[in-house]
Amino acid sequence: MIDADGFRPNVGIILTNHQGQLLWARRVGGQDAWQFPQGGINAHESPEQALYRELHEEVGLYPQDVEILACTRGWLRYRLPHRLVRHNSLPLCVGQKQKWFLLRLLSDDARVCLENGGRAEFDDWRWVSYWYPLGKVVAFKRDVYRRALRELSLAHAQLENSNRKELSRG
């Protein structure tokens, strides 16, 4: 499902643990390409439905394993480099338009599983600090990551503050 401008609708997933760290995953393929989980929105599927489907396909988690904390307001777009555009495909896809979700992990991180019946997207993952991905993601996605992280940073900071309060009471 590609829009009239050539952008494929997509969801991006920023998953945070109770320490405020983000799940950062390495793509299969051996090029040391790390990113947040993401995936396309199918026809007749809402962004939230796509989020939960992709969450399970890519990292093995279910809706009950997470809580949605925030979502970007509009679509964030990036263009694919010319070498990655499939010029012989119709309709032509020139990039992605994404809704980004910030999720809190409610379950133990041992539930993260990268092999879920289909072709695995990732072969490794780790927890990283909130702004770490900006210096590591592939260049053509960097602006979208910056905009998503900036827009979702208030919700993330509020979660970190509530976690600190719980620990100090504990």
UniProtKB/Swiss-Prot annotation:
Signal peptide: none annotated. A motif (Nudix box) lies at residues 39-60. Residues 6-150 form the Nudix hydrolase domain. Pfam families: NUDIX (PF00293). One of its GO terms (cellular component) is cytoplasm. It comes from the Bacteria. PANTHER family: M7GPPPN-MRNA HYDROLASE. NCBIfam families: PRK00714.1-1, PRK00714.1-4, PRK00714.1-5. HAMAP family: Nudix_RppH. This is RNA pyrophosphohydrolase. It comes from Cellvibrio japonicus (strain Ueda107) (Pseudomonas fluorescens subsp. cellulosa). The gene is rppH.
